[in-house]
From Swiss-Prot:
Pfam families: TGT. The lineage of its organism: Eukaryota, Metazoa, Ecdysozoa, Arthropoda, Hexapoda. It comes from Anopheles gambiae. Disulfide bonds: none annotated. Heterodimer of a catalytic subunit and an accessory subunit. This is Queuine tRNA-ribosyltransferase accessory subunit 2. PANTHER family: QUEUINE TRNA-RIBOSYLTRANSFERASE ACCESSORY SUBUNIT 2.
Length: 432
């Protein structure tokens, strides 16, 4: 995998092209860009046919995580094919990572020589040998070595130091395994930068990885958050400071990745700081868990006075609104369906609801990144940032509370009866 840097602007980030894969030499990705977040190798809620309505080009870059692909190992091994062939995505690049950006890890202490992975069957500790055996079975186009990046702004210095020490140990062993492996000669490595919110530890992590710079096709900035919906509540300014400092130390000729469900405003800040590639977990969480459609504006020439960033499809006010989710949107959902229909699908718990929301949100995100690249090329990203900053956001999503069914009268009466003394119960038994 090769990254070609084409433009570095003064205040808008940089433009480049990611490509040069051994398996797919003609596949490329214009950056800044995103790769598609997947569950078990599939984009959540969308079939390959539905994806054609989002992006006419069937070729793309896929983000795979071992937490929801681990169960495929035995089947892929028996089939003697790559994971790209197994998930019927041979025309797509497969990038394998440790964590799923949409899933928060379960709290717990990590083992000394293993990393906890949170699968659909619960927590499982995976050793370096097990991880590299899995990578050899999958044979992805690119992968990240095993690392400990479970830190956030609340992590102690001791935890950040442990994260760095464990990661350095894992990376050294992975590099040695990779060099000796015949199965991984066509797979690229991506170096994980860890260290929490400690700038000195981040510098040490970058310095350690750059000792083997030739072995890495790019770098992944990790350890900023604990993934999942909580990313929306993180301190964006603190994370941005760490990202900007790390990007200054990384080589310009290598691609920089940073994953998480970041809101669009923070994405723009990270692009300006030098990040090249993101993921679509933000789109998935908005559609599947929050039932919200992305409607933020990225047209800086718009004269509309008020913009909102999201549309809550669960709101009863859309029950008789037969307009599209976003006026002027060219996606399949907005062209064929209305707000009232999507609201109805939510009320009836129809499977089509999240499908239509995912199609709209992904299309909107595709167009958003086109606008980002346009503004980076013209060094006008601050205009887009200011335009987005003036838009109104909905209150943070709160999951609905489970309604308790009313207790039957007979059961309630039993609970209200005074409890008998233990001695009285024994006396009754003796008399009986």
């Amino acid at each position: 995998m090769k990254f070609t840097l084409s433009t570095v602007t003064k205040c808008s980030g940089r433009l480049g092209v990611l490509g040069g894969l051994d398996r797919l030499p003609n596949l490329s990705l214009q950056t800044p860009a995103f790769i598609f977040h997947t569950k078990g190798g599939s984009i959540p809620h969308l079939s390959k046919e539905a994806m054609q309505h989002v992006s006419g080009d069937p070729s793309c870059f896929l983000h795979l995580s071992i937490s929801n692909t681990l169960h495929m190992q035995e089947a892929i091994k028996a089939s003697r094919i790559t994971i790209a062939e197994f998930i019927a995505q041979s025309n797509c690049a497969t990038l394998l990572f440790v964590r799923d950006p949409s899933e928060p890890p379960i709290p717990g202490l990590p083992e000394k020589d293993s990393l906890p992975i949170y699968t659909r069957n619960g927590r499982r500790n995976i050793t370096l040998e097990q991880y590299m055996t899995l990578v050899e079975t999958f044979r992805p186009d690119a992968y990240v070595p095993l690392y400990d990046g479970d830190t956030d702004a609340s992590s102690s210095k001791k935890r950040d130091q442990k994260s760095l020490d464990r990661t350095e140990k894992f990376v050294e062993q992975c590099l040695e395994w990779h060099r000796k492996s015949d199965a991984l000669q066509s797979s690229c490595l991506i170096g994980p930068v860890v260290g929490g919110y400690n700038e000195k530890l981040r510098e040490q992590s970058v310095a350690f990885l750059r000792q083997s710079d030739d072995a890495f096709a790019g770098y992944l900035i990790e350890g900023l958050h604990m993934h999942g919906p909580s990313v929306a509540r993180m301190d964006g300014s603190a994370a941005l400071g760490i990202v900007a400092n790390v990007c200054k130390q990384l080589p310009e000729a290598k691609v920089r990745l940073c994953f998480g469900s970041y809101d669009p405003a923070l994405v723009l800040e990270m692009v300006a700081a030098g990040v090249d590639v993101f993921d679509t977990s933000y789109v998935y969480l908005k559609a599947a868990q929050e039932h919200r459609a992305l409607v933020f504006s990225f047209d800086v020439t718009s004269t509309e006075q008020e913009h909102v960033t999201e549309l809550d499809t669960t709101d009863a006010r859309w029950a008789e609104d037969f307009g599209p989710l976003l006026p002027g949107c060219k996606c399949y959902t907005c062209q064929k369906h209305s707000r009232a229909y999507v609201h109805h699908l939510h009320n009836t718990r129809e499977m089509l609801g999240p499908i239509l929301l995912m199609m709209h949100n992904l299309h909107h995100y595709v167009e958003f990144f086109k606008a980002i690249r346009h503004h980076v090329a013209n060094d006008s990203l601050p205009e887009l940032r200011n335009h987005l900053a003036g838009q109104k956001s909905l209150p943070p999503y709160e999951p609905p509370k489970e309604e308790k069914l009313p207790m039957p009268a007979a059961q309630k009466a039993e609970l209200m009866e005074p409890m008998e003394d233990l001695g009285e119960k024994q006396n009754k038994k003796q008399r009986a």
